Design a protein with these regions (language model features):
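ABC family nucleotide-binding domain
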Residues: 2-167
Length: 168
């Protein structure tokens, strides 16, 4: 069974009196373990598609089935739960909390998932070690280079061991 199935996904926005259709009937199936890249010129709908795939936005029409569950009728809190358990995110701007250590930044998704502190701390430390930052885990983002901040964001994206990792 595919991990992600999109059927006739459409997304449009109303701007003034007009309607702008960004996504036009997208069909897609992604199996667990598959690596997929969305490519296209600026303004082609990549970010819109990523927001839908990441359950950050809903399509205007069509069906999105994530791990066997139709996301179309889910509430915002149900979508948040799915994001926390099934999707790891690495944002282009990293979205690190400025006055928080690398370790605490990586722990955030685990806090939302209700993972108790001893396990949470250990998993965050393991994720930072995987990205080569075990020696910088107590540094705040301003004390890290851009590349190190990016690796903190990657560690935060993988710490929940979600089946999907989305990177922008």
């Amino acid at each position: 069974m595919p991990l992600i199935v999109l059927k006739d996904i459409r997304k449009s926005y109303t701007m003034g009196d007009g309607k702008i259709e960004i996504l036009h009937g997208i069909n897609l199936s992604i199996d667990k373990g598959e690596f997929v890249a969305l490519m296209g010129p600026s303004g082609s709908g990549k970010s819109t598609m990523m927001n839908i795939l990441g359950c950050l936005d809903k399509p205007t029409a069509g069906t999105y089935i994530l791990d066997g569950e139709d996301t179309g009728n889910l509430t915002d809190s149900q979508l948040a739960r799915i994001r926390n358990r099934k999707i790891g995110f690495v944002f282009q701007s990293f979205n690190l909390l400025p006055k928080t250590s690398a370790l605490e930044n990586v722990e955030l998704p685990l806090i939302y998932a209700g993972i108790p502190n001893p396990e949470r701390r250990l998993r965050a430390m393991e994720a930072l070690k995987l990205v080569g930052l075990h020696d910088r885990m107590y540094h705040e983002p301003t004390q890290l280079s851009g590349g190190q901040q990016q690796r903190v964001a990657i560690a935060r994206g993988i710490v929940n061991r979600a089946p999907i990792l989305m990177a922008d």
